[in-house]
């Protein structure tokens, strides 16, 4: 696995239950500012059944970027951790954003 993925995944593993972070914040914390899209691509390529808490990563507007069934799946996982998610996949970053 390349160093970028190692660092990105290490940061994502640190996001605590009941909190979220953004693609851009993950990239910045991993030492790759400006690589938000690459974080999204890396998460999109995860194998089925990955233990990485990918669902805790959302976009900078506080919304789930996925569509359809994938949006529903991410929404369910976040709600199971006590995070309030609107019908359109919006999360209150002021309340749920991870501040390491």
Swiss-Prot record:
Q: Where is this site: Arg finger, required for nucleotide flipping?
A: 37
Q: Which InterPro entries match?
A: ATL_DNA_repair, MethylDNA_cys_MeTrfase_DNA-bd, MethylDNA_cys_MeTrfase_DNAb, WH-like_DNA-bd_sf
Show the GO MF annotations.
catalytic activity; DNA binding
UniProt record, GO biological process = DNA repair
Residues of the signal peptide: none
Pfam families reported in the protein's UniProt record: DNA_binding_1
Q: Where is this site: Required for phosphate rotation/nucleotide flipping?
A: 23
| Keyword DNA damage among UniProt keywords | yes
What are the record keywords, sorted? Answer: DNA damage, DNA-binding
Q: Which CDD domains match?
A: ATase
What the record says about family reads:
Belongs to the MGMT family. ATL subfamily.
Its biological purpose: Involved in DNA damage recognition. Binds DNA containing O(6)-methylguanine. Binds to the damaged base and flips the base out of the DNA duplex into an extrahelical conformation, which allows processing by repair proteins.
Q: Which PANTHER family does the annotation name?
A: 6-O-METHYLGUANINE DNA METHYLTRANSFERASE, ALKYLTRANSFERASE-LIKE PROTEIN 1
What name does this protein carry? DNA base-flipping protein
Natural source organism? Vibrio parahaemolyticus serotype O3:K6 (strain AQ3810)
